[in-house]
């Protein structure tokens, strides 16, 4: 695939309460030996994305330990590699990531130094299976600047947990709001 991958794994979720007191949500155990980030990593590997950056922040120690061996996903350095980035305090930047857009912004040099023409951004705390090749094919066919994978939220009271989209009849995004208190729309971004 002609894309580089970024997995956002730095957030905390107050709904997880005690479960996230000592570990990042992306490091939460799933079915025994797996962690929630393994699903995004497997999706990247199965889509033949060979260069992946994981952006960590909150309670990242156990996540970093889990990621220290990339052999499970075959992100060898010769083909690309698995990179783990934490917020870095510099003269220009004295803050932790101030959200997902800022996490991407603070790591723009990684993207600028890459040769892949496309970027796949995924969440590290979602459990799903997705072929990013199909998403990229759709993206190219639509000649889109950005493609957001979305679904309908069955419970309108739950939209406050997601990014909410309003799209036109051509499936072009006309409005996007991250975690609104209330929304008349129920199309939400996933991953």
Label every model-predicted segment.
Residues 1-191:
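Unchanged
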